[in-house]
Amino acid sequence: MGLTSNKVLALAVLAAVALFVATIRLWPRLSHRGRRAVLGRVGLLLATQSAIFAAVGLAANKSFLFYGSWADLLGREQEMGVVVDHSASSRTVKVVGKQRPDVPGGARPETGGQIHKVVIVGERSGIDSPAYVYLPPEYFQPAHASRAFPVTVVLTGYPGTAENLITGLEYPRTAFMQAREGRMRPMILVMLRPTVAPPRDTECADVPDGPQTETFFAQDLPAAVAQTYRVGTGPRNWGIMGNSTGGYCALKIALHHPGRFAAGAGLSAYYKAAEDPTTGDLFHGNQAERRRANLLWSLDHRPQGASSFLVTTSEQGEGNLAGTREFIRKVKAPARVSSITLESGGHNFNTWRREIPPALVWMSGRLGTG
């Protein structure tokens, strides 16, 4: 049974409940003086509390995927990666592995699609970043052999792991199910974290004498994917979305590069670049770039292109409600803005899982095929 399986979590909860009941029933017998009684009380308390902490820890890990397996938890996951050469590779996208999506018919690409584990080589930025590429089943079907597919870049928060987009937030499975049910058109997902120069949080900026992260996302990544896969190359074929830091980056890239991305979606996004010990000095005193990294300032002082934006927040539980409302007020034609406002939510996977299905449907409606 895997670390994140429902069976393990259920067993932990049952053990905690059983020990709690046992403590209540046995406590009168152990209320006497004497070493045995004292040791019995201490043992029951330790066992019950350990079981409760284990259940809570397993539930938190299942939600946030801090560790993916028992070996990962115990520090035994040390096997080196193996580079695999595949025909899908190009000069700027190296395919190093393939895997089945967790969907019905996932064993066959033409019925379940396929996920490629890749390394994207940034020729202009000099950044190489790992990523996952989800190809929908239609990509492998003869009837669509000449079709160019729309692409959505999907970003995690900081520091994030790209694997969480697959196993935790279930982007490929959600896209597959929404397309199968006719709610959205099939699209390719390029999934990665915004931390392309770890451990630094660059806030998707081109840092002077540092990582050129904005260039990587706005120029290198679209060019690399277009060289490797059957995708459209116009702005109407490309969208970008993410949660938290990834949401800020998605809105920023779509706002500043409408000639590349027709749509940007920020789930629980913030609207001004963070500046803290994880980011370091992003602007080196360049106030123009600091202002440009403030999306609310940019909406007021820079031309707005024809991109569409989706922003999400909650009436209770999230700290970006006021900023989101201000962002909505400031978007002007030809740009467009839509929103999702939950009654209550938080800065967590559970909230984003509620927003991802409608966000993907929204994104599909803004993008076209090549």
Where would I find each of the regions flagged by the language model?
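Non-catalytic cap/lid and distal C-terminal segments of serine-dependent acyl enzymes
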Residues: M1-G370
